[in-house]
């Protein structure tokens, strides 16, 4: 067996000085404290070696400095949500499967949920929602094991893959429109906007938490597997894929409902601190008003987004994929009082039936 031969000669004074300068530069760049070497205690934190960077630390994506460009406006401005709408119209709801396609989609979501819970070490003190219309639809039955850090681990991982379905579906419909030499009837824009919105969720949480190397590797693998799997499935059955995303967003609404309840019940004291504010990126994107910029308010905004995605995908799963227009960007007559749109004024948790919108 080949073994590399190492030199045992002591370093010269110039070499020692160079190593000292390099170590000092590294410590200064990453804001490391200047202390003596101590025994390393292995971390028991699952899935990540990251650290919270809300107030102090290294910004993962600082604002670039350009000479003439002052700011870049979002490609899809976020529709306004009122506080009353987010708290009264958004709640956990489950659409019961009606055919084999729905059951396949629901089964895949439940399997994915189990895999994600196992990978992120997610454990909560609940069993099941009480009722579909209860915004606090949980019952505590187990010892509480979550924390702010564990919630951020879950948020970052989930949002890193949540933006995949909209991008894949929009890309495939775009390519089909090109090769078919026909219009898409407004689906592409809504799907790409959904992917953009999920990415903004991820960027918001990355302003509060920096994932470690292991988590980055897991995200890379999960994205590769999920992208290719969803790509192939959408080629064969786009209806099943939209139903899958609808059920996936049901789980997202439940996840954020649980975290909001934890915060309101005092289990997450760091986020309940009045000095803990939402990142500037989130305040600008959602247009969060003064007095409603806390972590609790941020979770309400994100949960409302997930509820909107749930409505959109359950609705798209009810339509004829090749010929029906997208009802969320369509213009209806004045005689139609209740109609879908980009906001949550007429939110339907289980989606719109085809007969209601076409």
Curated annotation (Swiss-Prot):
The gene is AOX1. Its EC number is 1.-.-.-. Keywords: Electron transport, Iron, Membrane, Metal-binding, Mitochondrion, Mitochondrion inner membrane, Oxidoreductase, Respiratory chain, Transit peptide, Transmembrane, Transmembrane helix, Transport. Pfam families: AOX (PF01786). It is found in: Mitochondrion inner membrane. The chain crosses the membrane at residues 152-172, 218-238. GO terms for cellular component: mitochondrial inner membrane. It is a multi-pass membrane protein. Belongs to the alternative oxidase family. Binds 2 iron ions per subunit. The keyword Cytoplasm does not apply. Its cofactor is Fe cation. Fe cation 1 binds at residues 159, 198, 201, 306. One of its GO terms (biological process) is alternative respiration. GO terms for molecular function: alternative oxidase activity; metal ion binding. Catalyzes cyanide-resistant oxygen consumption. May increase respiration when the cytochrome respiratory pathway is restricted, or in response to low temperatures. Its main location: mitochondrion. Fe cation 2 binds at residues 198, 249, 306, 309. It is an enzyme of class 1 (oxidoreductase). Disulfide bonds: none annotated. This is Alternative oxidase, mitochondrial.
